[in-house]
């Protein structure tokens, strides 16, 4: 860092409008030579009102500013302290523009010589972080941030994180630092000066033994696992006792029973289904069972989970904690497909790419740092999004491996036989080939959250042809000699002529003409599909916000598909006998397109279940054609059931109507399953009430205004009495947004933050919801499971409608042919499972107390009400009007105190 002084600034303001809002708090942390040397903090008085949202966000109320100075009273002192410093902030444009305007209003011209944005720094230094919000960065790197959105604490936290980043940069190999310096010249801010100083002052020394070099890339040396040796002669019971004692957990007989049951099924190569209710401690139970099985037999166990979050928890938290508690060395490894792992040849190609783009430049710098620290090369560690992900995917698709490439998948394969536990997810479990050498090493598998397997299987058997994807794939090739792969081919042909390369001539003009025709044929194909949509019955699938056509003639589509496949075959003939790597990249892309169209053609000819989906009825570009290639039951049977000698399905919601039959029939083979139920009967369930309003009109599809108004009335009643947060679950985006609009217009919610589910933003929204004391979260099916919200007061989950899939839902259409009675055998069990998962959002531990409100009267007034009532056996149930609801809330609130 040298001896320069950095002024790390954070401002709190009345809003984000530069011309209308004021600063209400300023915090500055001064850093020199990787140390905090001074701080400055002041509240700033304003004549503007502080909006309720800002008060909730910052905990700054208007009375806190009454004795504070106006900015013009402290401006000169702040300027004097900052004028010679490097200006630093997180999302620097916001803070810099606000403080420059505030200075200008005081007749002070502030122009810092150098500006650094820590958002830019942290993206580069911490490439695997899931979020670059300050509070989440602080938590990820062990920095205490008690009061986020307070300027003094935010500035200090930003400074501490910046110091961590700079310390990390200084420890990098010199070759990596030099590359970062050259790339940093294309950043928005002045980070290149920092890298220049680091390179200039670098203490030259040989490359550390922990690194290796591939071309210009320095990467972390891969260290193979040693074959584990676990010296233990005791029983599972004593192993369990030691684990819970060392981990500070409560000894639970039901948890031990679950572990013993799993071990017994593994030892006897059985197929089993286990419903283990909330609080049974599934993860610890099956980890101990898998470990004990390995100790006794030497065999390793595959564990498949539903989410990345649970995978990370097992690998980064639970297994390391067990290692420490038991004084063992459990080798565990994340198992995925080859395409999920990086190759150094691909990184080298990306670094050499001359694409001039800010996000691509950041990605190159992230890759340089990531490859010095990743032990696995798992691409998902990078959490790529948006333009970076599109660019990276493009590079993967067109990459032809180098001769001496280093691929991290080979490391995974090499070490798989030296592990005790393999961790995978349902998608990879179902997608993996039987011939896959890694999966062949496992005879035994535990499938956690097994109730989600059918959804992943349906994704696996459904083939998709989308306009956007095909246009993107064609775009990677280009339409003329100045674009993408066609440009590379054109340059190759010129090189062949000038340098007399030993390859056959390439018909550039013929290739251009062929590509233009392929583009035209693709447009014709989707125009045909667009015409079919306009001439057909269209059904809305509101939960996914698409319009679907289920019944249509395929004759014209097949004609267009045949034409485009024929043209792709003729285009591929241009490259017969040419093996240059540039040609291989283009051939790879053309073959991908041909296979995509050919698979759809074959499925349509065979009469497989298909449907057309369109997001915007007026835009051809939003069309997708789906074809179901195989039965879900066939895939689950072949890819899961037949792959392992012993197989244990475990979930909190496997049973339906007191039976495992609904889950059993997802397999088309008459296999015997042992079935078990582990019920902990949490006391907290008895502390939770299910309230069913009697004054809400039955849901009417064509007129839901009254139904929505009733939901809002109950939300008002709840928030008025409790001042607590609330989760409201919907089965329709339309209803969710209607409720959102009403809440935003009502004065009762001025001091509440109303959050709504958004695409690809669930993690961020959950974090915001958990951070606010007064918040309402409106969500759809995504939030029926896998989401635990935190609340100090009463917890409340409101369920707008029972989570039945609509008969115009794509899943319903695709699964219909696999059941005799689709509603009874598939739709109803699915709805009950989702409802049980929704109840589980509230009950997470013994201390939870709260209320579940179900507005759907089908819960008590339908032919299947008894099945839903089974899910409520452990809850106190009450039916009544809104006054009785308020009375119940006051009773719960009194008990909570």
Curated annotation (Swiss-Prot):
Single Gene Ontology BP annotation: DNA replication proofreading
Pfam families cross-referenced by the UniProt entry: Helicase_C_2 (PF13307), RNase_T (PF00929)
Residues of the Helicase C-terminal domain: 703-883
Keywords tagged on the record: ATP-binding, Exonuclease, Hydrolase, Nuclease, Nucleotide-binding
Binding residues for ATP: 276-283
SUPFAM superfamilies according to UniProt: P-loop containing nucleoside triphosphate hydrolases, Ribonuclease H-like
Residue ranges of every copy of the Exonuclease domain listed in the record: 8-161
Listed PROSITE patterns: HELICASE_ATP_BIND_2, HELICASE_CTER
Enzyme class: hydrolase
Placement of sequence motif DEAH box: 448-451
EC numbers for this chain: 3.1.-.-
GO molecular function: 3'-5' exonuclease activity; ATP binding; DNA binding; DNA-directed DNA polymerase activity; helicase activity; hydrolase activity, acting on acid anhydrides, in phosphorus-containing anhydrides
One cellular component (GO) term of this entry: cytosol
Domain Helicase ATP-binding: 241-496
The protein's role, per its UniProt record: 3'-5' exonuclease.
Record family assignment: Belongs to the helicase family. DinG subfamily. Type 2 sub-subfamily.
Identification of the protein by name: 3'-5' exonuclease DinG
Naturally occurring in which organism (per UniProt): Staphylococcus aureus (strain bovine RF122 / ET3-1)
Name of the encoding gene: dinG
């Amino acid at each position: 860092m040298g001896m320069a002084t950095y002024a790390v600034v954070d401002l709190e303001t009345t809003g984000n409008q530069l011309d209308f809002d004021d600063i209400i708090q300023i915090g500055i942390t001064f850093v020199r030579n990787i140390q905090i040397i001074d701080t400055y903090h002041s509240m700033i008085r304003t004549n503007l009102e502080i909006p309720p949202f800002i008060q909730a966000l910052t905990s700054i109320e208007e009375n806190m500013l009454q004795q504070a100075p106006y900015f013009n009273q402290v401006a000169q002192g702040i300027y004097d302290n900052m004028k010679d410093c490097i200006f630093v902030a997180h999302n620097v444009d916001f803070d810099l523009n606000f403080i420059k305007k505030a200075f200008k209003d005081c007749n002070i011209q502030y122009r810092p010589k150098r500006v650094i944005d820590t958002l830019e720094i942290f993206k580069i230094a911490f490439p695997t972080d899931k979020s670059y919000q300050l509070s989440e960065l602080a938590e990820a790197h062990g920095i205490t941030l008690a009061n986020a959105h307070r300027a003094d604490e935010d500035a200090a936290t930003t400074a501490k994180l910046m110091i961590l980043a700079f310390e990390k940069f200084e420890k990098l190999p010199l070759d990596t630092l030099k590359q970062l310096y050259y790339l940093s010249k294309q950043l928005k801010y002045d980070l290149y000066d920092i890298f220049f100083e680091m390179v200039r002052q670098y203490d030259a020394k040989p490359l550390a033994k922990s690194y290796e070099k591939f071309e210009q890339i320095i990467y972390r040396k891969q260290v193979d696992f040693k074959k584990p040796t676990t010296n233990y002669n005791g029983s599972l019971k004593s192993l369990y006792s030691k684990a819970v004692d060392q981990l500070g957990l409560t000894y639970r007989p039901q948890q031990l029973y679950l572990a013993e049951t799993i071990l017994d099924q593994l030892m006897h190569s059985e197929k089993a289904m286990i419903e283990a209710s909330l609080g049974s401690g599934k993860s610890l139970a099956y980890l101990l069972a898998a470990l004990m099985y390995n100790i006794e037999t030497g065999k390793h166990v595959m564990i498949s989970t539903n989410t990345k979050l649970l995978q990370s928890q097992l690998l980064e938290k639970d297994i390391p904690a067990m290692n420490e508690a038991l004084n063992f060395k459990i080798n565990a490894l994340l198992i995925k497909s080859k395409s999920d792992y990086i190759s150094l040849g691909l990184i080298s190609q990306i670094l050499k790419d001359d694409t001039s783009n800010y996000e691509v430049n950041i990605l190159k710098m992230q890759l340089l740092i990531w490859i010095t620290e990743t032990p696995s090369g798992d691409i998902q560690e990078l959490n790529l999004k948006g333009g970076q992900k599109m660019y990276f995917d493009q590079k993967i698709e067109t990459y032809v491996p180098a001769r001496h490439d280093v691929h991290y998948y080979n490391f995974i394969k090499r070490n798989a036989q030296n592990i005790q536990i393999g961790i995978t997810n349902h998608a990879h479990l179902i997608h993996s080939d039987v011939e896959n050498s890694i999966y062949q090493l496992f005879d035994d598998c535990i499938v956690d959250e097994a109730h989600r397997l059918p959804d992943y299987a349906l994704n696996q058997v459904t083939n998709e042809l989308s306009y956007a994807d095909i246009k993107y794939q064609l775009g990677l090739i280009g339409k003329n000699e100045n674009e993408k792969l066609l440009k590379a081919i054109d340059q190759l042909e010129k090189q062949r002529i000038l340098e007399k390369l030993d390859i056959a001539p390439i018909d550039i003009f013929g290739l251009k003409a062929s590509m233009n025709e392929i583009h035209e044929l693709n447009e014709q194909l989707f125009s045909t599909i667009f015409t079919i949509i306009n001439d057909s019955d269209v059904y809305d699938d509101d939960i996914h916000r698409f319009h679907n056509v289920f019944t249509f003639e395929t004759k014209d589509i097949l004609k267009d598909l045949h034409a485009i496949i024929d043209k792709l075959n003729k285009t591929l003939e241009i490259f017969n006998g040419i093996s240059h790597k540039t040609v291989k990249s283009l051939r790879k892309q053309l073959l991908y397109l041909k296979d995509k169209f050919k698979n759809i053609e074959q499925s349509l000819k065979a009469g497989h279940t298909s449907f057309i989906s369109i997001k915007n009825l007026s835009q051809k570009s939003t069309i997708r054609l789906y074809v179901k290639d195989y039965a879900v039951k066939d895939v689950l049977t072949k890819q899961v059931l037949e792959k392992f000698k012993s197989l244990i399905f475990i979930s909190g919601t496997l049973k339906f109507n007191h039976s495992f039959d609904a889950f059993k029939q997802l397999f088309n083979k008459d296999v015997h399953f042992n079935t078990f139920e582990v019920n902990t009967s949490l006391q907290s369930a008895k502390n939770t009430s299910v309230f069913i309003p009697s004054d809400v009109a039955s849901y009417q599809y064509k007129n839901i205004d009254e139904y929505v108004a009733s939901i809002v009335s109950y939300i008002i009643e709840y928030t008025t009495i409790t001042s607590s947060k609330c989760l409201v679950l919907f089965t329709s985006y339309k209803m969710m947004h209607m409720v959102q609009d009403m809440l935003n217009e009502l004065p009762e919610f001025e001091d509440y933050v109303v959050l709504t589910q958004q695409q690809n933003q669930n993690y961020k929204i959950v974090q915001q919801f958990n951070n606010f004391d007064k918040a309402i979260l409106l969500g759809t099916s995504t939030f029926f499971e896998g989401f635990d919200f935190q609340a100090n007061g009463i917890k409340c989950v409101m369920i707008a409608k029972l989570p039945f899939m609509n008969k115009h839902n794509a899943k319903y259409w695709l699964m219909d042919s696999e059941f005799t009675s689709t509603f009874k055998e598939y739709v109803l069990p699915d709805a009950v499972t989702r409802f049980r998962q929704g109840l589980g959002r509230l009950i997470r531990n013994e201390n939870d107390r709260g209320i579940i409100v179900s507005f759907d009267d089908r819960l008590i007034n339908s032919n299947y009400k008894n099945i839903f009532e089974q899910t409520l056996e452990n809850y106190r149930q009450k039916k009544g009007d809104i006054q009785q609801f308020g009375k119940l809330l006051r009773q719960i609130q009194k008990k909570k105190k």
